[in-house]
């Protein structure tokens, strides 16, 4: 070996010795883990965006994600989960389709030793130790949602000079945990004010076409009783269905005296547009991309050997024409 070659090797060795040891990837523990995700209909813009966000974040940490979709069919979801148990996935991410039907299913999951992350809908109550059937829940506080949008409805009604009002609810799926929590909190908020009442709730399963049909039928039904004063569509596409039905029936929608008041939720593109044009009074901040990212982070936490906190609620706020501009981009998914 020449003196020059010896010097080169010595220099290289010195440089390598000075470099820090290769750090294991932050996702090393999660690398290669197989995750099965069970969602409602991913054609729904919120659920589709959440699923995509979760998969992108989890895949970035080395996980392999398979998504199963169900059209709010608890029997199909149970079958999908049972099939996945047999395939020995490392983690399940579940949107509860039916509170009652999911308990025996998740009991089988627990007995198989597979941890569960809940998204979208919470586990309600503790029947058969239901709160022990999942590792962590990531989502939004639906009771708070109902309260906030109820207060927004009341403000909009009172701002038009009304001293009393009849309001209808176009609900998401009442079999899951989410819609019933919102509906009850909304009713409670309205009931605090004498003369204001929720007169009917229709379960439209988050479907805008079903929401439009139900709204049209309710407008006709209450026409002989002085009419309805407001609609609460639990997401903005359902609220948009109510607006379409009202306009089709010749009922003026807006936020001024004599108008039908419509509020929504989940801050979606139709809501951004309708608030901007004055046809919708309010919505609530709810971002599926952020929910998906956080659920993936909680999954990674578990694989990294950490114990995620039991429940994590993302922040929300009421959105009206006064602040729609600052949220329009994030809500237009």
Predicted regions and their residues:
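Hinge/cleft segment of the Venus flytrap/periplasmic-binding protein
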Residues: 31-33, 170-174, 178, 189, ...
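Extracytoplasmic "Venus flytrap"
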Residues: 32-61, 66-83, 87-89, 93-99, ...
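Periplasmic-binding protein-like
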Residues: 36-38, 88-96, 115-119, 169, ...
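Short, solvent-exposed amphipathic alpha-helices that sit
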Residues: 46-63, 145-149, 177-196, 214, ...
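Short beta-strand elements in bilobed, periplasmic/extracellular small-molecule ligand-binding domains
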Residues: 59-70, 166-169, 190-205
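Hydrophobic alpha-helical segments within soluble ligand-binding/sensing domains
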Residues: 77, 136-165, 211-215, 267-271, ...
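Hydrophobic alpha-helical
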Residues: 94-111, 186, 199-273
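Flexible loop/hinge segments that line or gate small-molecule binding clefts
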Residues: 105-144, 166, 268-276, 281
């Amino acid at each position: 070996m020449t003196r020059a070659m010896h010097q080169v090797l010595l220099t290289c060795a010195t440089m390598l010795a000075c470099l820090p040891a290769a750090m294991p990837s932050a996702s090393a523990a999660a690398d290669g883990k197989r995750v099965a995700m069970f969602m409602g209909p991913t054609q729904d813009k919120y659920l589709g965006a959440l699923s995509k966000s979760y998969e992108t974040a989890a895949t970035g940490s080395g996980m392999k994600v398979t998504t199963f979709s169900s059209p709010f069919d608890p029997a199909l979801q149970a079958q999908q989960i049972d099939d996945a148990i047999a395939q020995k996935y490392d983690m399940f991410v579940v949107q509860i389709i039916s509170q009652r039907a999911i308990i025996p299913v998740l009991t089988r999951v627990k007995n198989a030793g597979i941890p569960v992350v809940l998204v979208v809908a919470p586990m309600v109550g503790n029947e058969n130790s239901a709160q022990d059937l999942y590792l962590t829940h990531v989502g939004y506080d639906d009771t708070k949602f109902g309260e906030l949008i109820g207060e927004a409805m009341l403000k909009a009604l009172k701002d038009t000079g009304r001293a009393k009002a009849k309001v209808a609810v176009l609900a998401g799926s009442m079999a899951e945990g989410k819609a019933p929590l919102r509906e009850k909190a909304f009713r409670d908020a309205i009931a605090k004010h004498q003369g204001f009442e929720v007169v009917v709730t229709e379960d439209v399963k988050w479907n805008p076409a079903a929401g439009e049909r139900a709204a049209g039928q309710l407008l006709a039904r209450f026409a002989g009783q002085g009419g309805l004063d407001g609609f609460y569509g639990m997401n903005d596409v359902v609220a948009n269905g109510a607006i379409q039905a009202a306009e089709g029936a010749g009922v003026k929608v807006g936020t001024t005296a004599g108008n039908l008041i419509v509020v929504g939720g989940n801050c979606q593109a139709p809501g951004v547009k309708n608030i901007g044009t004055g046809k919708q009074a309010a919505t609530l901040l709810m971002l599926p991309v952020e929910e998906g990212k956080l659920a993936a982070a909680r999954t990674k936490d578990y694989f990294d050997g950490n114990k995620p906190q039991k429940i994590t609620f993302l922040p929300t706020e009421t959105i009206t024409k006064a602040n729609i501009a600052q949220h329009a981009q994030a809500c237009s998914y």
